[in-house]
């Protein structure tokens, strides 16, 4: 099932994204949820916190897995993904800290940590709902251009484009500060271990890669395009991210 939702109002997009996660918890209180970091999910996370505070949605039985984490960054660093997830979401919920799973950023053996993380996902019987966003070069998680479809959780070398984007977003002040590698779920991991995926993309800067993701044949240059092969992926876009889509794609979309 491939569904495309296009939102005229960005706030409605965030509300819809949050509702997908809240509804999953209501359906299965011990769901396994997959999360992402960066700018895209922030408003959604704020709405999840608001829902927990106002509606008392409980996260105590939830297990979480994050898509990725930098290598060789202190977990207490403000740009480490574990720190971001705690600051933006987990610290404000009743989630059990023992059920929060993110690759260890300070592992002495990142390749082994990647293997361990892959095995942990499998032993958990996968992920019920995974939040994913698309990178400026079309990557999902840190599956950079050229990552094969059969990739499992692995250590990824970040491209220069990704590194410069991190600096442009004021994540790091210089190239020297930016981690050059990340542990990431692989493309095969995402396709095989995630039962449902919600891909969220908004903003003019994402229009070209959103078009490639949805309309190009699945290929390694835009790893997000492999999501076309997932049996249960919904695409949640704003009108700007959808602005370059062709007429055929737009006809299939639901405008909200």
UniProtKB/Swiss-Prot annotation:
One of its GO terms (molecular function) is identical protein binding. The active site is at residues 68, 137, 139, 144. Signal peptide: none annotated. It is an enzyme of class 3 (hydrolase). It catalyses: alpha-D-glucosamine 6-phosphate + H2O = beta-D-fructose 6-phosphate + NH4(+). It comes from the Bacteria. The keyword Lipid metabolism does not apply. Its EC number is 3.5.99.6. PROSITE patterns: GLC_GALNAC_ISOMERASE. Catalyzes the reversible isomerization-deamination of glucosamine 6-phosphate (GlcN6P) to form fructose 6-phosphate (Fru6P) and ammonium ion. PANTHER family: GLUCOSAMINE-6-PHOSPHATE ISOMERASE (PTHR11280:SF5). NCBIfam families: nagB. This is Glucosamine-6-phosphate deaminase. It comes from Mycoplasmopsis pulmonis (strain UAB CTIP) (Mycoplasma pulmonis). The lineage of its organism: Bacteria, Bacillati, Mycoplasmatota, Mycoplasmoidales, Metamycoplasmataceae.
